[in-house]
Structures are given as structure tokens and as C-alpha cells.
């Protein structure tokens, strides 16, 4: 009759503020194709997990948002209840939604001289559907207010596709992985990496990748910069799951001032 694993960790001594999460037992016992396993983590890179990171023991659900990876684990129950009792479920969130693919900017010049090239950088979260490319678009804000309102609607796919989109460059894997790894090398047997410690493909699902683009100069004016992802299935952000309660995926918009 086992159907669900329910667990929670220590946050404070108030039972009303208990932070709970749960998983179907099938996800605990078997991994979807290409996905890492659900684990109880007590060490990271050979060192005991610090309290800041959720130690002494933390649940890690690789393809899920953070509320599934409960810190400071204290209780774990096996249940025949089919329904999720997650704390986030009580707040009208989709607790079974896996990570989405989306992108955002990291560095955008707020003031730019007219007709001079400028660079924009950002990162992309690579969800379960992978990442094919990152695209950017610049729109002059002199468009009519009605048209601007249609373009500002991140869920209006027709308006977004009417813009001119240019592919950015997805940067290669880092040469230094950090984390005090021996010889700065990903250990053999790590999911997604070959025997030499190099990624089998890039970007890796359930990771983040950096992107960059050098844009040509623009005439003086006020502009809106947008960036979006296209996943391995060809779905364009915020699709295929544009719902806010299923995780963040809206198309970021940044204002740019180009001065003469």
C-alpha cells in the first residue's frame, strides 16, 4: 500500500510552521531517464554538509524546486496517502512541477552611447527539457502604448514572436569547477560527465549556463531588452508551462537608455 514518502525538517519549535514536502514513492525508488537519483545528502565534495546548506542531513530532489529539497531533515514517513501534503500545496502552488528552462540577464549597461556596440551577459537555468539556445530582442519604446502593452504580455506568444530575435552565445563549461575537487576534476561516474571529467553534452540539464552577446550600436532613444530560451523540444519561453504557480518562467524586460 506504499504510495508516498512524506518528510519535514527542523525550522523552529512551532508545529504550525512546519515545512513539509513529499514525493511519490516511484520517484524515490526509480529515476526517470537521464535524471540523477533522489538522495539524503550528508556530505558535499567529501566534507560534512554545513548547517547553512541544510546539514546534518538534507533531502535533494535534483529536478525539483528548492521546497522539495528540505533542509535539516528530522522526520520521514512512508504513507499510503496518494495526495501531497506539501506546505507549498496549501499556498496554491504546483508542487509536482519540475524545473523550467528560462534565462535572465546578469550585466546590462543602463546608459549607452549612440551607435556604439555594447555587451549583455546573463545566465540560463536548464530545466528538464534542456536548452537549445538563448535569444535576445531589442525594441524601441517609441511604439504605441497599445502595441507595447501587447508585447509586455509575456504569455502572448504571437506578440513575442513578432519581435526580431537574435541568438546569443552560450558560454562553454568552466575550466575551474571549484568546490575543492581533487585535481579540479569531476569524479568518474558522475552523471552527465565522461571518464575524463568533461560534460557529455552542454549545457547539462538541471544546471545553469552563462550566455553573452555583443550588440551593434543603436540610435539615441529608450529601448526594451528581452531575453528568452528555446528548449531542446523547440518550446519558446515561457512555454510549455507558462503558469506562475508552476515555477518562474516569465520573459525578463530591461530598459536601456541610448544617449547621443
Task: Give residue ranges: language-model regions.
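Extended, aromatic/histidine-rich regions of cofactor-dependent oxidoreductases associated
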Residues: 1-260
